[in-house]
Amino acid sequence: MNEKFYLESDIDEIVNNLKKYHKKIFGKKFLISGANGFLGKYFIKTLLKINNKTKNKIKILAIDIRFDNCELYKNKNVTKIKKDINKIDNYNFKCDYILHAAGIPSPKHYYNKPIETIFTSITATKKLLDYAKKINAKFIFFSSSEIYGNPDKKNIPTKETYNGNVSSIEDRSCYDEGKRVGETLCYFYKIKQKVKCSIFRPFNVFGPGMPINDYRVFPRFFNSIKKKQPITIFKSGKQTRTFCYVTDAITAMFLVTINGKQFVYNIGNDKPELNMKKLHQLMQKSLNKKIKSINIEYPNNYPQVEPQRRCPNITKLKKEFSFKNKVSIMESIKRFYHWSSKYY
């Protein structure tokens, strides 16, 4: 991944969205697992940008199994630990917030690494919860909308109170069930051990910085566009999603991290709900260009079953923070295209 994983204007937008909360995190310390991942990088970049507004610097401990050659990790306010999060027993970093973003969220990758996927959501989560208790830090668990499985029609848009319709013995189960157990750990540490804790359930967050080999819909489509090849739509393309641009998602996540009073939050966009054919049409309209498409079967190295609909109820975010998604799907497509045209 090229080290320019973001649009500078996107980072400025996130920082501006959070301006009333800057003083609350001046001088704070953040431990971030999965620091080299898509969301982890955005958290670090945003915190470092906020650092420009104060002499009381925010400090970051960044943990990941590998790190790109990225300017983030060369900053004097960032300390790196290059190691598997499951194998770390001593962090030596007294912090205010622990953000557990480590995981394997891409279906192609967790299909090929199911055991590692499960234990990152369980072993590492327990270790970090124990550490949060020890140092009295607020713990944030990056879960997933996957924990809802394949909701029935009456539970879409899906509320945080929906218990899910999830199989424990399918290709996606390593990720879905791992996250569900991770959430259960958070629940009992919160009520039994009194750990300050919140959970994010992101719904189809996308934006600059997604790896070209991620295999989720936006990297896959835009990689094909860059190569002037038809985009590939799995099966009929009738499965629907709502998509949340990264600036809106990171803004919501920071709001919960800094000031969230509740336990579980859906993070995403509640409209529009699009099937892949409609997304293809919007891409052509937004970019003002003809883009060919073909329908294909799921590849052998990709889970053969996926939710048919995915759309969050984000009433909790709206009520608690007066939150609203600011970046439309049309604008999101333009921004992703602008970035991927240069870096894919």
Model-predicted segments: where are they?
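Conserved Rossmann-fold NAD(P)-dependent oxidoreductase catalytic core, especially the SDR/UDP-sugar
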Residues: 100, 126-172
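C-terminal substrate-binding subdomain of Rossmann-fold SDR/epimerase-dehydratase oxidoreductases
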Residues: 1-6, 58, 84, 204, ...
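Conserved beta-loop-beta element that borders a ligand/cofactor-binding pocket
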Residues: 144, 183-208, 219
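NAD(P)H-binding glycine-rich loop region in Rossmannoid oxidoreductase-like domains
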Residues: 85-120
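N-terminal Rossmann NAD(P)H-binding glycine-rich loop of SDR-like oxidoreductase domains
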Residues: 29-49
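Active-site helix of classical SDR
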Residues: 174-181
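Non-catalytic terminal and boundary segments that flank Rossmann-like NAD(P)-dependent oxidoreductase
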Residues: 1-30
